Structures are given as structure tokens and as C-alpha cells.
């Protein structure tokens, strides 16, 4: 190279939360929803794809809908607010477009939708939205929405879960949930992503 330049990149993501069959489903879904909706979904490491065993899909969707219902939208300065606005009108419109795309793609609208939350007339608010039965190759499962939208994707076995988790252009973050920490770490090692949270653990920026 003729020269070197210093620069920093703000990377995007479509991070997968892989919930294995032996995981505490309620804990895993709650942890995934909380992560996904942090900063109203405007987080590069947001767990926006939740992969669940097919036989637990409906239960996981119900748990996610219940968790989302507790995310009260409103003024970020109010103590009761759990979900603030998006950064701009342009971003709000983009997220709403993706919600409509998800509906047209045939995903099941479990919670939320394209309408503004009730009582949030001022500000760029979008309802926290959960889609079920999302196809891994659909646009809402492949493209970064950067808003409060969670895609629940069913899988048949562990190998398929890993394949789906790795099946995007992104590789920023991810999560694995299992009753067996050692097995969770083994699965985490198969995810092609920069960092993986195991059973809700977080990284420590002070760690070497």
C-alpha cells in the first residue's frame, strides 16, 4: 500500500440469539427482547433474530409479546418510559417500511405493527414489533432495520440453528442460551461473529 490511514468503522449487525432446546425459554426470551429493544433497537449489537426450536416457536412468540407489552413508550425523561423514539423521521419511516415488508413477506405479526404507539404523537415513535414464523432468507431477517423489531425464526435442529445464525452478511454479535454452559460455549464457537453472549453474560470492557 502507498499509505495507511487511521479510521474507525461503525459496523452493522443482524445478530442472532440462539435459544437451544434445553434452555430456560422464559429467561432466554426476556433477555433477547431486552437486548433487542435497548435504545429502541438502535444498537449495532442488537439481538434482532431470535432462533427457537420449532416445537417451542409459539410459546416463544407469546413470551416475547408479553415482554414487549411491558415496554412502555414515551418521553425518555419519564421514569416509566421503557421505549423512546427513533433518531429521526427518516429512520422512523424506514423502520415502518420494514414492518410493512415483513407483513407482505408473510411473517406472522405477533405484536406491534406500523402504527404509532398510542399517546406518542410527538417524536419519531414506532411500536415495539415482534414477527413470528420468519423465513431466514426474508428481507426482515437479512437486512439491518435498526429499530424495535424482533424476528422469531424456528429451526428443526442445532445444525440448522447454526446455519441460520451464520446465514447473513453480518458478523458483529450473537448469543447462545442453554442449560449446559459447556455446550453453549461449544455452539458459540461455531458462530461466525465477533462476540457471543452466553446465557445472558455480558462483556467487560476492562478485561484483557
What residue spans do the PLM features occupy?
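A structural signal for short, well-ordered beta-strand elements
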Residues: 21, 88, 151-156, 177
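Short, conserved phosphate/pyrophosphate- and ester-handling motifs at nucleotide-, phospho-/glycolipid
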Residues: 53, 148, 180
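Terminal low-complexity tails and localization/encapsulation signals of metabolic enzymes
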Residues: 113, 181-208
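Cytochrome P450 core scaffold surrounding the K-helix E-X-X-R motif
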Residues: 137-142
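Short amphipathic alpha-helices within nucleic acid-binding modules
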Residues: 157-166, 181-189
